[in-house]
Amino acid sequence: MTDLIPLEQAHCLPRKGSDHKLGEARLTELLPQVPGWELAEAGMALTRTFRFADYYRTLAFVNALAWIAHREDHHPDLGVHYDRVVVRYSTHDVGGLSENDFICAAKTAQLYDQGITA
């Protein structure tokens, strides 16, 4: 991936095998580009909790996120609650985090920041 375009404008590419697993140096470079997201599971996953006023807005966000996930062919694990969604990205095919996780994290944050569900 090129760092010349913002992550939220990039698109996911098929990534398989440990060659695509991000190392510590690359994780350190990419994490500041997705504010609010945290490394979890010893750097094997990327997580963030998004909060909403009610269940309707929570589910509207989940449905919009499902469309992004389908379009990018990269799907998060979701914990859906009345007023929040916990989003977790990891690339199973590489055994950890890939650039696809950061691309989708940026797209997810952009969706939330745009107030699509407000």
From Swiss-Prot:
Keyword Lyase: yes
Annotated SUPFAM superfamilies: PCD-like
Family membership: Belongs to the pterin-4-alpha-carbinolamine dehydratase family.
Enzyme class, UniProt record, top EC level: lyase
EC number: 4.2.1.96
One Pfam family recorded for the sequence: Pterin_4a
GO molecular function: 4-alpha-hydroxytetrahydrobiopterin dehydratase activity
Protein name listed in UniProt: Putative pterin-4-alpha-carbinolamine dehydratase
Catalytic activity reported: (4aS,6R)-4a-hydroxy-L-erythro-5,6,7,8-tetrahydrobiopterin = (6R)-L-erythro-6,7-dihydrobiopterin + H2O
Family matches, as InterPro entries: PCD_sf (IPR036428), Pterin_deHydtase (IPR001533)
CDD domains linked: PCD_DCoH_subfamily_a
Key words, A-Z: Lyase
An annotated GO BP: tetrahydrobiopterin biosynthetic process
